[in-house]
Amino acid sequence: MRETVFPLAFRHGLVLLVGLLLAGCERPPKEPVQGGYRGTGMEQIYNPRIIESQAALNAEPKIARAARLRKDAPTAGETYENIKVLGDLSIAEFGRTMTAITAWVAPQAGCTYCHEEGNLASDGKYTKVVARRMFQMVQHMNATWNKHVGNVGVTCYTCHRGHSVPQNVWYKPATPRNEGAMTGQKDGQNAPGPLTGLAALPNDPFSDYLLGGNNIRVQGKTALREAELDAPRQGVKNTEHTYAFMMHISKALGVNCTFCHNSRSFQNWEQSTPQRLTAWHGIRLARDLNQHFLTADPLLTIFPANRRGPLGDVAKVNCATCHQGAYKPLYGSHLASYYPAVWPKELRPEIPPGPPPEPQTYPAVRAPRTQ
């Protein structure tokens, strides 16, 4: 009897174990896309089902018809009160921009999400002060960080996608209760979370690289400590933080490590793909926004408690804030070229006359092959 019960229990246990091991895996099919010399692992692995599910998220919003330009038309700054950023726009273009930002950021709440009803000029709502600063931030990105955003540019919709608060922001994690006890502190490890692809790596891979000014470093290349200028940043602990951050980038862009790195030598820049340089600028772009806009006045002090993290810090950006699972936000949509307000005055594009183009719902777009 025992010989019969034991094998049966063993088989049931084995089936349960296999089920648990496979629960974290994506079900097929998988589609590899070669991005380098064959047989070297230089490829991207895509799941067509997941790619298709992202199509709606990365579809362009409706583009409003461009305002008709008149040389003698008064500007918004000459007509309305308390216009501090977009005052040089025509009244028609200013109204078009306000309509667009309402649809991009607060489609449910409408104009009163930022404005006081009956007194649109008032700065009484903190959201209006935030929106003004966000316009300055977007213009700064489009003017200064073309090495990352290229000539495509960004808009409010790039991050918000119809939500008043972007769905992918980060706060500093709360300190565990046993922090500083006899067992020491875990440095955020062994607490898998979505920010690091559910890995047991440090759960705050952003404070060092996207808020602080630290450079990415891994373990040293020799057995003994290297007498280099940046050697203090090399070691196992720094490697763990680096890999946590790399997991985030991979998940945020929906790509493998070899999208940026060469499989035979991850650290070698000469053998890396062109995307690695774009990512290098992207890291510094996010750091710039976090340091000089999101954690600086007036935003640092104006956000209420319900818009702050567990440690009281404000929301900050990372790679997923814009990319949201796509190797290019909105798969490279040129939405910004139809809205002059998101560019500084000297860089504003001319909007072609006539009806606007129909919104593009991009197909299941994969990252291109590396040349």
Language model region names:
Residues 2-113, 118-371:
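N-terminal export/targeting leaders of redox proteins
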